């Protein structure tokens, strides 16, 4: 026990000395926080390494080998002579890429490689930051691409919601589901922008790991679940309408509200409790944990169930069309087609995530594709469910035509008034007749009756 304490004290002493010196200097508070986090990580790794060195059994294999060691940043196991050991770069520093590799060579004599310039044992960390500049540039591009995607999504979704709320003739249960789906995407885009700009992009905040950023991540994951479960509600509604209720019109929407807004709370809460117990760090942002399957699992299940419902709906509708050729079946087929297009598009990123390719260019292309698929979903949903919707297009076209006719009639009415005024002034100057003569120029009607001449726009569509 005394030996362990002495070793720990001996190797931690330089870090405490550095800490005292650093505290005497004036530095940026954020830099001090990041520096403190880096020191804590190194000290923790060092302590765990020496614990491992003392507790692991002695090498029993025959032959020459290099002894286990701590190189200052990473811990290395016993390695056979003439081989190269490799592990991932540490995440101590912002310019280190944990996906890159660190190498350490054990020579033929069973000694760790020494650098010729210093004649000291040396570990090759050069690959950890060799591509940092390019990766930072790519990360910034992806960041701006994400923000643009969510801004466009919010704008298109709000326009769509405005259309649905303004035109009362569009009100029906399916449009109500659309409204909830759109609202969930708006909320998700807003919280994502806040989360990316205020939390994920603030290394000092992530390092301190406050409760506020964990709440932000919790809301973000909850709303992401709401997006997919409202898509499931769309599929269930159509399935009930077409397959179960045989074209019945009314359904109870309470269960849809529970599924769309209530059920995603369950995996979000379970994930929060698990992260609090096992991975309570980095504002719960780190993705190198299997706990994310608590969120992604139900989402994938919802996508699969939705796909099954939609395929079954298509089967039933095709059968009905062959037998009855009902126009109503054609209308349902159009609604199903829109949902059937969206389901694979909204879920394809969960299929692609495990298949990340190898290679710099391939990884960059993959990142851009995943980024677009994930962060432009709101724009895609509003485009397919609203802007490409035949009913919406028809009512917008009809109202636009009414506006043009009304504007044209108002313009003609203004010209009529100007013409009448000119005629009155001419007659007054020439003959001195009363203004009642104006009625002849208005086909026997007075000025106040001219509104009755205007064609009523709504009559055009009776």
From Swiss-Prot:
Biological processes annotated in GO: adenylate cyclase-activating G protein-coupled receptor signaling pathway; angiogenesis; cell surface receptor signaling pathway; receptor internalization
Main location per the UniProt record: membrane
Extracellular-facing ranges: 23-140, 200-210, 275-290, 353-367
Residues at the site labelled Required for RAMP3 interaction: 251
Keywords of the record: Cell membrane, Disulfide bond, G-protein coupled receptor, Glycoprotein, Membrane, Phosphoprotein, Receptor, Signal, Transducer, Transmembrane, Transmembrane helix
Superkingdom of origin: Eukaryota
Protein family according to the UniProt entry: Belongs to the G-protein coupled receptor 2 family.
UniProt topology in membrane: Multi-pass membrane protein
Site, as annotated: Required for RAMP2 interaction: 289
Entry's Gene Ontology cellular component terms: plasma membrane; receptor complex
Residues carrying the site annotation Required for ADM interaction: 203, 374
Transmembrane segments: 141-165, 177-199, 211-239, 254-274, 291-315, 331-352, 368-388
Stretches the record annotates as Required for RAMP3 interaction: 289-290
Disulfide-linked positions: 49-75, 66-106, 89-128
Modification sites for Phosphoserine: 421, 446
CDD domains: 7tmB1_calcitonin_R (cd15274)
Protein name: Calcitonin gene-related peptide type 1 receptor
Signal peptide: 1-22
Role, per record: G protein-coupled receptor which specificity is determined by its interaction with receptor-activity-modifying proteins (RAMPs). Together with RAMP1, form the receptor complex for calcitonin-gene-related peptides CALCA/CGRP1 and CALCB/CGRP2. Together with RAMP2 or RAMP3, function as receptor complexes for adrenomedullin (ADM and ADM2). Ligand binding causes a conformation change that triggers signaling via guanine nucleotide-binding proteins (G proteins) and modulates the activity of downstream effectors. Activates cAMP-dependent pathway.
Molecular-function GO term, any one: adrenomedullin receptor activity
UniProt topological domain (Cytoplasmic) ranges: 166-176, 240-253, 316-330, 389-462
Subunit organization: Heterodimer of CALCRL and RAMP1; the receptor complex functions as CGRP receptor. Heterodimer of CALCRL and RAMP2 or CALCRL and RAMP3; the complexes function as adrenomedullin receptor.
């Amino acid at each position: 026990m005394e030996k362990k304490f002495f070793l720990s004290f001996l190797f931690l002493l330089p870090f405490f000395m550095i800490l005292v010196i650093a505290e005497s200097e004036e530095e940026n508070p954020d830099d001090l926080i990041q520096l403190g986090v880096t020191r804590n990580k190194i000290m923790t790794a060092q302590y765990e390494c020496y614990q491992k060195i003392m507790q692991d059994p002695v090498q029993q294999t025959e032959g020459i080998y290099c002894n286990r060691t701590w190189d200052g940043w990473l811990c290395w196991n016993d390695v056979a002579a003439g081989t190269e050991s490799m592990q991932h770069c540490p995440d101590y520093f912002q310019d280190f890429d944990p996906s890159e590799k660190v190498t350490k060579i054990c020579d033929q004599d069973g000694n760790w490689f020494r650098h010729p310039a210093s004649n000291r044992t040396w570990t090759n960390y050069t690959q950890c930051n060799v591509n940092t500049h390019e990766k930072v540039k790519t990360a910034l591009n992806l960041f701006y691409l994400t923000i643009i995607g969510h801004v466009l999504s919010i704008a298109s979704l709000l326009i769509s919601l405005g259309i649905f709320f303004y035109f009362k003739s569009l009100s029906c249960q399916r449009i109500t589901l659309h409204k909830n789906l759109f609202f969930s995407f708006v909320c998700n885009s807003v919280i994502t922008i806040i989360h990316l700009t205020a939390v994920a992009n603030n290394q000092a905040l992530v390092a301190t790991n406050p409760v506020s950023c964990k709440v932000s991540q919790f809301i973000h994951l909850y709303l992401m679940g709401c997006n997919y479960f409202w898509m499931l509600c769309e599929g269930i509604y159509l399935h009930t309408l077409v397959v179960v209720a045989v074209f019945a019109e009314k359904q109870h929407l309470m269960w849809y509200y529970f599924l769309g807004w209530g059920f995603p709370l369950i995996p979000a809460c379970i994930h929060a409790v698990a992260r609090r117990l096992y991975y309570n760090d980095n504002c719960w942002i780190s993705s190198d944990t299997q706990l994310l399957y608590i969120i992604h699992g139900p989402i994938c299940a919802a996508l699969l169930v939705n796909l099954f419902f939609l395929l079954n709906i298509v089967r039933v509708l095709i059968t009905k069309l062959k037998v009855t050729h009902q126009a109503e079946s054609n209308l349902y087929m159009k609604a199903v087609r829109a949902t059937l297009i969206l389901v694979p598009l909204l879920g394809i990123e969960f299929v692609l995530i495990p298949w990340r390719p190898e290679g710099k260019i391939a990884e960059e292309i993959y990142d851009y594709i995943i980024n677009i698929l994930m962060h432009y979903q709101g724009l895609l949903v509003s485009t397919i469910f609203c802007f490409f919707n035949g009913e919406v297009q028809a009512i917008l076209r009809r109202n636009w035509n009414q506006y043009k006719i009304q504007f044209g009639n108002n313009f003609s009415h203004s010209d009529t008034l100007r013409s009448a005024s000119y005629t009155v002034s001419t007659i007054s100057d020439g003959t001195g007749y009363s203004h009642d003569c104006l009625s002849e120029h208005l086909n026997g009607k007075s000025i106040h009756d001219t509104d009755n001449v205007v064609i009523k726009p709504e009559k055009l569509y009776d």
